Amino acid sequence: MPEISVQGLSKAFGGVRALHDVTFTVRDKEFLTLLGPSGCGKTTTLMSVAGFQRPDAGTITCGDRTFFDARDKVFLEAQDRNLGMVFQSYAVWPHLTVFGNVAFPLKIRRMKKEALRRRVTETLELVEMAGYAERYPHELSGGQQQRVALARALVYSPAVLLLDEPFSNLDAKLRERARTWLKRLQGELGLTTLFVTHDQDEALSLSDRIVVMNQGEVLQAGTPEDIYRRPATRFTAEFLGHCNILTARAVTATAQGAAELVLHPGGQPLTVSGEDLTAGAEVQLAVRPEAVELSALSEAAGPNAYKAELRGVSFLGDHYLYELDIDGIPLTVTDTRSFPGPSVTVRIPPSACRVLPP
């Protein structure tokens, strides 16, 4: 499977910037996700790769083929790109059976009847829909329609698979099963895949790498773990999962891989590791709720430990969500244990603090 290279992509609609210098590569057999809120430019990027949108600047290549080059005025039409596309709405044709929907791309390619039947049957078996070939879309569930749309995108062996929020119309349980099934299928087939979603759980569970977008720009690209544990911006930290953003001031410069900060003047020092800081610098810290350690107030505190007042608690099945207050500073923490309060000891490990760039 070829790789997709997007370089310097820009696009404006009526003077409103939709994309600005968007650059990334989808590697061979990789599952890459464009993640961001509504209006961030992720779908415009996907539609540009698919050939449904013509950018204003930049290049798009697939292997040794140029799909788009603004400078050389190259624009390959969507039907000539050999890409598989699954839309958010599935777009299965209601007047055709499951077999007819999946067979349509082969019919317009004028595949011989026997080869067509064999290929459609193989593809329906691949997506576990072989027993539904003669049913119509209105006789299928949302998850089944989704598989029909995927089969239709795969049946002609596309170079790359594109998916535009394909799970958004499914309920939570079905989405979870669909994610597991799609990831397994993508791995088995070795499909180079470009996926678009605003759902952080989908991005984390499916992706080999994630490209975080906002306001038409790429903010960060990396593995799910890298982006979650080492966010490059406040937006990324807050958008990908839950995160505490704490304002602190460095009281010592970084020495031997560690520096001391305070959350408020005269406060207890907070040691952070792996960050290059100068004394007096004001910084923002990203701290994940699950990285903070809770204990009963009577237990020994130690370094980076604070007394916190319990302001609220929510039971969420496999864990509790605690809303705490440290000398007027709010902090959200998750823990599997129950703490009755009214006060607890909070310890913030040095490695749990990520200093965000200014």
PLM-predicted stretches and their roles:
Residues 58-69:
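Conserved ABC transporter NBD signature motif
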Residues 50:
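Helix-to-loop junction immediately C-terminal to a conserved catalytic motif
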Residues 243, 253-358:
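Non-catalytic connector elements of ABC transporters
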Residues 35-37:
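The feature captures the beta-strand-to-loop junction immediately N-terminal to the Walker
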Residues 5, 25, 61, 345-347:
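ABC ATPase nucleotide-binding domain
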Residues 11, 23-26:
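Conserved A-loop
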